[in-house]
Amino acid sequence: MKQSILGAWGGILLSLSLLSAHVTAQTIRITYPESRAVFQRNLDQTSIIYVSGNYFQPIDSVQARLVFENPGQGLSTNWQTVQRNPQGGVFQGPVRGTTGWYRLEVRAFTGRNIIGEDVIRKVGIGEVFIITGQSNAQGFQDLGAAGAADDRVNCVDYDNFANSSLADPPAPKFQQLSAGALIGPRGQSAWCWGILGDLIAKQYNCPVLFINTAWAGTTIRNWVESSRGQVAKNIFAIGTPNENFPTGMPYGNLIIALRYYCSLFGLRAVLWQQGETDNVPLNLQRKEYADAMQFLVNQTRADTDRYPAWILARSSYNQGKVSPSIIQAQSDVIGTYNNNVLPGPFTDPIQIPRPGDNVHFGGDGLRQLAQAWYNTMDAIFFTSSLPLLPLPQPAITTTCAANGSAVTVRLPDGYSSYSWRSGEKTQALTISTPGVYRATLKDLKGNTFLSPAVEITNPIRPATPTITLARQPGTPATGDQQVCSDSVLTLTGNAPSDIRLIWNTGAITRTLSVGAAGAYTVQASNLFGCRSVQSAPVNLVVRPRLIIPIISQAGTYSLKATVPAESGFGDFFDWRRGSNALQNQNTSI
């Protein structure tokens, strides 16, 4: 066996490369919430933003913070841990903050190293309102609606005016409340609400979100009938094909908003502006209106198992006539003890006579209406109305399916229904096609929850890795590799950042030092836990430790190298003079 006079062999460096792998430039991405989402604050001015997203390479933890968009518009937070040791490519968790308008920033860690960041601009903690009632709440185009000047005043960007769908709205989108904005799902302009939003944002230094479910021409009876599942009739279209309101309407939009947007973002109050049609032409009496109004308030609470606050405008003016009975009925509901119903503006004296049909506000009347609403939202209102806070986002788990070529995404127990965007109605979904998957969950009352989004990329089963020698990159290693017993063999994994390397020793690492004889293989494992097949093995043969030769003088001008006979070595030697190798491998020189 050949020996070196200068010492034993050093370690041999091998490298591992993958045949192919998915590579993504972005390490982490926020998928919820969307820009301009506003989360309802509590009485102590705080709230929780439930954040979720995807990551695309192994990470140890995710942190988030809120940074004010503009000086004076909030209190920036310190970094908060959203989740430790996230699994399956999805992270989720709460971020706590105070009233303000923020950038939501997240960062991903491996160990102490930041390996990825993302940001969502314009996310708020403030006030959320659902508008409902009839035309003076719904609004119109071309009557002088003024948009909000403050960038922090927002509305839901969803139009259900024509379709009158009873299905859940699409994933929430928002827009700044400009003059012509359609305040989803049914508002027809900024109406007075843009100005009201400006007033609230300025006075309380907070963002505002409006959702509008009002329906022109509706009576209090229409709202009660549709809440009971009965067909509501449009009194202005009797005998025409449009006599019946669409199925479930007008109540459908209101209860969907309470179950959907309120669950996700919370709610300060329902703003009710209605009563004109119950005056003219119906001439409804005090008790009937009061009973119906209280029934409607109670029904929204029974249908959600929550206790939303209401603010009732006192409104009855229609074509020059007012109704003390309607006004008193509205006041009766407001005055009911422990009802969480508060007084809104008395609108009958505003802009008399009114333009056009002498019922709808317009021009400066909309400014007056907004001011009247604002005047009722004083400090007492904000401390006495009981807000509903956003509900936690359901947890989600992702694992590799048994066949190794699909991913199983599982939603938590405790919900009454599960519905995937791809159409399935199951609690767990096995996915073999790349895409973004999200589910809608409902509790027994129909309150809606959105799961975190899961992004599945190809290949679901990673490619099989190969092992190559460092001195021969790109060439798969073949045959046995040898080291001496006092040395180690170091295997280095060269793989894309979204892949983990799992050795047959159980080690999960990119470099592996081994000194025991045997066969070594490696598997590629992705974020979902799906593994490739085992690589071709590298067989390690371990030779006994080389004995340091003893050099002695054999003659006047010769040297001799010897090792103990029992060592089994001594056939060949490498001789050197200084750093120069000599062309002699004999025992003497």
Where are these regions (language model features)?
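Short intrinsically disordered, low-complexity coil segments enriched in acidic
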Residues: M1-K2, I49, L199, G506, ...
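Bacterial Sec-dependent N-terminal signal peptides
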Residues: M1-T27
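N-terminal hydrophobic or amphipathic segments with adjacent small-residue motifs
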Residues: S4-I5, L19, E127, A269, ...
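Acidic, contiguous N-terminal accessory segments
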Residues: S15, N42-D44, A470, Q482
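Cell-envelope and extracellular/periplasmic
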Residues: Q26-L391
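Proline- and Ser/Thr-rich low-complexity, intrinsically disordered segments
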Residues: N375, A379-I589
